[in-house]
Regions:
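Extended beta-strand/beta-hairpin segments
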Residues: 1-52, 59-141
Length: 141
């Protein structure tokens, strides 16, 4: 399986602008810039896209883990908070924190925790990141 996305950047780092697109078309010339990345201006940035990908990947991985334990989730809601810091080697993604809440009928806390931990380590996006990944997982009734 392969997935494809592209980016075009025009101009210098601080005064330039770019667009990002995905082969599916869900991202189509979506703008980004220095200010959307480092100054909290409205718009997207690479780190936000990584966080979104991680939240989506983890949610699907958790669903797979639960299904493998004969548990069917009603809902899984995941947010990913990515931390990027300037280190001696330059800007580095140092951590991602996953906050997940799930409704899973018939699940007990132990089974849910096992599924969540397996999803955290087994999610393909988790595997590609070298950052510390922490998690708060809540089973809701």
């Amino acid at each position: 399986m392969q997935r494809k996305a592209s980016a075009v950047w025009k101009g210098g780092l601080k005064d330039g602008k770019g667009t990002v697109s995905s082969a599916s078309g869900i991202l189509s010339n979506t703008p980004y810039s220095f200010s959307t990345r480092f100054e909290n201006a409205p718009g997207t940035n690479p780190e936000e896209l990584i966080a979104a990908a991680h939240a989506a990947c983890f949610s699907m991985a958790l669903s797979a883990q639960l299904s493998g334990a004969n548990l069917t989730p009603e809902s899984i809601s995941t947010s990913a908070t990515l931390t990027m810091e300037k280190l001696d080697a330059g800007w580095t993604i140092t951590a991602v924190h996953l906050d997940v809440a799930a409704r899973v009928p018939k699940a007990d806390q132990a089974a849910f925790n096992t599924a969540a931990e397996n999803a955290k380590s087994g999610c393909p996006v988790s595997k590609v990141l070298k950052a510390q990944i922490t998690m708060n997982a809540r089973l809701e009734k």
